[in-house]
């Protein structure tokens, strides 16, 4: 017996069509939200700078409206092969500064993006020279107010920012995000913090410290990468270029340069869940050396080293989704708003140490930091500057 195939009636087809329309509209809506959330109130211009015989490529991000001259925030990267936008991570910051009337300038690290050279060939002094060249280049532009140029830097930039500010006393400010003071102490702190996080046993901890000491002994005697590899066996991702970079920079300490830059307004940004940097030591040294009247310290208790919320950073899928759908929400609490308010207060001549409200809890330095010329006391760490005017 033959059966008649049933086909959807007009109402059935109509339901299918409307269901498809709904799916398409939803998809278009989501796509629209993603596009909107990744669109910033900025005018970005690709720029280039010749420095030390090499061309550096970068981005100048100006406020969306106005002809300037604008203030300028020059970005100084942390460790690694960072491009000008830090894979777009900087753009929310640029937008916040733009709302305060400041442009942002950032270059691809040498050997990254469009820049020539190799960042692993650089010392911290080389990085400071590069930053000074960027500042000088910016002062030559009619759309930039040369009196309103400051620095923003994170992590490893903590050894670069003070060098630059010590040599260019015209800088309006320095914003130091999660900086360390001493390379060796920072390395030990980071190692032990990661071992605690990973639940290492006492034996594993001692083995890691022995390996670290072996590495330091090799660095002290100027050993080659081949000698390092022969001594430790598993190089754990170390490359010859990275070994050379560490050998060049492992003695870095910001203390003397912090003394030399005293008087420049500084915003010190510290995270509550930082396992890379000993924020207690950093804060103590900054408060000891820098005048109270020029230092603002902002604590973000929920943040990790990157100023992303610690809980968000621990969830890869949430972190990825947030980066795509709501990139401004990557940063903790009121971090973005308080970056902008710091430079705005400098522009208006308002007291820069006034506490902010919100999660950042920026507050003035109330310690006994060196307020008077000639007093840069050495009570925090051996070697802290003394008698620096």
Where would I find each of the regions flagged by the language model?
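Short beta-strand/loop motif that positions the catalytic acidic residue
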Residues: 261, 268-270
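N-terminal cap/lid segment of alpha/beta-hydrolase-fold proteins
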Residues: 33-68
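Short alpha-helix in the alpha/beta-hydrolase fold that links the catalytic acid
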Residues: 277-288
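Accessory cap/linker subdomain of secreted extracellular hydrolases
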Residues: 175-260
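Conserved alpha/beta-hydrolase
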Residues: 94-114
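Short beta-strand element of the alpha/beta-hydrolase
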Residues: 69-78
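The serine-hydrolase catalytic nucleophile loop
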Residues: 82-93, 109, 280
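Alpha/beta-hydrolase active-site loop
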Residues: 121-142
């Amino acid at each position: 017996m033959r059966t008649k195939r049933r086909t959807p009636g007009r109402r059935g087809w109509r339901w299918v069509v409307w269901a498809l329309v709904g799916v398409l509209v939803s998809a278009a809506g989501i796509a629209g939200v993603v596009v909107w959330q990744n669109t910033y109130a900025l005018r970005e211009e690709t720029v280039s700078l010749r420095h030390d015989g090499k061309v550096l490529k970068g981005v100048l991000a100006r406020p969306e409206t106005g002809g300037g001259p604008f203030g300028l925030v020059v970005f100084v990267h942390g460790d690694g092969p960072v491009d000008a936008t830090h894979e777009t991570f900087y753009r929310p910051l640029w937008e916040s500064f733009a709302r305060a009337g400041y442009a942002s300038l950032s270059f691809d690290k040498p050997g990254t993006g469009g820049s020539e050279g190799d960042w692993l060939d650089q010392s911290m002094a080389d990085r400071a020279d590069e930053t000074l060249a960027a500042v000088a280049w910016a002062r030559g532009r009619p759309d930039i107010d040369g009196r309103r140029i400051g620095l923003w830097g994170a992590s490893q930039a903590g050894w670069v920012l003070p060098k630059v500010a010590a040599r260019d006393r015209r800088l309006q400010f320095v914003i130091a995000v999660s900086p360390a003071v001493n390379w060796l102490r920072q390395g030990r702190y980071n190692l032990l913090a990661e071992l605690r996080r990973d639940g290492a046993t006492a034996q594993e901890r001692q083995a890691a410290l022995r390996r670290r000491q072996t590495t330091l002994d090799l660095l002290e005697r100027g050993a080659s990468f081949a000698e390092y590899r022969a001594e430790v066996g598993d190089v754990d991702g170390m490359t010859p270029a990275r070994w050379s970079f560490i050998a060049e920079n492992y003695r870095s300490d910001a203390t003397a340069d912090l003394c030399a830059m005293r008087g420049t307004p500084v915003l010190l940004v510290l995270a509550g869940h930082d396992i890379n940097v000993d924020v207690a030591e950093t804060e103590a040294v900054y408060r000891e050396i820098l005048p109270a009247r020029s230092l603002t310290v902002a604590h973000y208790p929920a943040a990790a080293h990157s100023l992303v919320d610690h809980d968000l950073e621990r969830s890869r899928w949430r972190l990825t989704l947030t980066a795509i759908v709501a990139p401004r929400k990557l940063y903790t609490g009121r971090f973005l708003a308080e970056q902008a308010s710091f430079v705005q207060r400098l522009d208006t001549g308002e007291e820069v140490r006034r506490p902010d409200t919100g999660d950042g809890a920026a507050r003035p330095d109330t310690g006994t930091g060196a307020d008077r010329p000639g007093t840069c006391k050495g009570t925090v760490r051996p070697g802290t500057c003394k008698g620096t005017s």
